[in-house]
């Protein structure tokens, strides 16, 4: 797909995310890799359900510099980190859904284990419900550079797959193209809802 087609696909995904209620009150941020040096990131404070092409800002991946001087998402550094770590990644989606936010708080360990669900196969490379998928959880931090450093240290020891959670904050997930990132988001959100319901029922 061309750059313009990918951007249109990302806009469509953003509007769909808005309809799902996964980025309330202008929360969340989305991005698209352009090349090895640049990406597009959503401007700060924009409602994700009504984004237009002008709401994406050009960002230099190595430095987070924005040539236009406008203000990108405060969490731009996490998007650019993912692009630097994994050259194959083409799009990153960050959402604030209720299920992701709550699960990231009730799970006390540093990873959410998903196992036994057929929908694990919505995640690239997963072929069976018998495997375990671990979604790392990082404690929230308003200092994004410090949070990015912790994510980078984890990724150096254990490569990230599909996404990670920030505790009490939300989900970051990605894909090689927008379509794959969107599928991973939808699959993970389904799995989060299943896992949350399972825990609630088992607690009764």
From Swiss-Prot:
Binds 1 zinc ion per subunit. The keyword Zinc applies. Its cofactor is Zn(2+). GO terms for cellular component: cytoplasm. Zn(2+) binds at residues 94, 96. It catalyses: 5-(methylsulfanyl)-D-ribulose 1-phosphate = 5-methylsulfanyl-2,3-dioxopentyl phosphate + H2O. Gene3D superfamilies: Class II aldolase/adducin N-terminal domain. One of its GO terms (biological process) is L-methionine salvage from methylthioadenosine. Its EC number is 4.2.1.109. Pathway: Amino-acid biosynthesis; L-methionine biosynthesis via salvage pathway; L-methionine from S-methyl-5-thio-alpha-D-ribose 1-phosphate: step 2/6. This is Methylthioribulose-1-phosphate dehydratase. It comes from Serratia proteamaculans (strain 568). The gene is mtnB.
């Amino acid at each position: 797909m061309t750059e313009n087609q990918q951007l249109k696909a990302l806009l469509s995904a953003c509007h769909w995310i808005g309809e799902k209620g996964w980025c309330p009150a202008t929360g969340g941020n989305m991005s698209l890799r352009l090349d090895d040096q640049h990406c597009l990131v959503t401007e700060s404070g924009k409602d994700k359900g009504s984004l237009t092409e002008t709401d994406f800002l050009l960002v230099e991946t190595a430095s987070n510099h924005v040539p236009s001087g406008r203000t990108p998402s405060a969490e731009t550094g996490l998007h650019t980190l993912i692009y630097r770590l994994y050259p194959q990644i083409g799009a990153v989606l960050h959402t604030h859904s209720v299920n992701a936010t709550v699960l990231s708080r009730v799970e006390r360990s540093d990873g959410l284990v998903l196992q036994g669900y057929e929908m694990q196969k919505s995640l690239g490379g997963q072929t069976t419900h018998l495997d375990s998928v671990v979604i790392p959880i990082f404690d929230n931090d308003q200092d994004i550079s410090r949070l990015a450093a912790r994510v980078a240290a984890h990724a150096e020891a254990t490569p990230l797959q599909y996404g990670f959670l920030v505790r009490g904050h939300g989900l970051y997930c990605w894909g090689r193209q927008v379509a794959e990132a969107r599928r991973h988001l939808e699959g993970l959100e389904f799995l989060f809802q299943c896992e949350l319901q399972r825990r609630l029922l088992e607690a009764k």
